[in-house]
Amino acid sequence: MGNAELQIIVLAADAGPPDAPPWQSALVNGVPLLPLMLGRATAVAGHAVSVVLGAHAALLAPALGRLPVTLVVDRHWQEGPAAPVRAGIQSLAGSCSGALLLHASQSGVTSAELQRLVDVWRRDTRAMVAAPCNAGHDLPAIFPRSEFPGLLALRGEQGPQRLLRRPGIRVVSVP
């Protein structure tokens, strides 16, 4: 199933600290964080990248005009981490076989690391593929279409890691 359609969803909806500039605009080696992460995502997936904005959408969206990404505005971002995940999944085309979820704050994640996740997933598009962490698995992670209902069922403070950390679930680890 090498031709399975994968979409990268970059999560950037939360507000960050009150009375502070948007964290998405923080500079990493002189480059604003959000465009940096979107550049890494598009290097792997081309135009198959969506970004979910929320709290600072009006401020951040104009800076994304030239990037080949789909903008999703989550009007329910204040609910917690679950809302932008749902907004991103709801925006996907029916032909989408899987979604790679990446939080925009993960500036340590490179395009090469994202590509490794994708390469492993393409060998078995029914598998969840994720980065290992102390608590089990974390983002970035690829969720096959069969996991979309679980992502859409998340509420409030529940993040997608909840699906990765279910007892007995098989997740392929890609360090």
Identify the role of each PLM range.
Residues I9-A13, L102-H103, A131-N134, V174-P175:
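Short beta-strand segments
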Residues G2-I9, A153-P175:
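Conserved alpha/beta core of the MobA/IspD/sugar-nucleotide pyrophosphorylase nucleotidyltransferase superfamily
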Residues G2-A58:
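N-terminal glycine-rich phosphate-binding loop and ensuing alpha1 helix
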Residues A20-W23, V28-P32, A55, V72-A83, ...:
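Residues at secondary-structure transition points
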Residues S25, L71, M128-A130, I169-S173:
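Conserved beta-strand scaffold positions in the cores of enzyme catalytic domains, especially
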Residues W77-R145, P149:
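Conserved beta-loop-beta/alpha segment of the NTase-like Rossmann-fold superfamily
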Residues L34-G98, D119:
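Conserved N-terminal catalytic core of the sugar/cofactor nucleotidyltransferase
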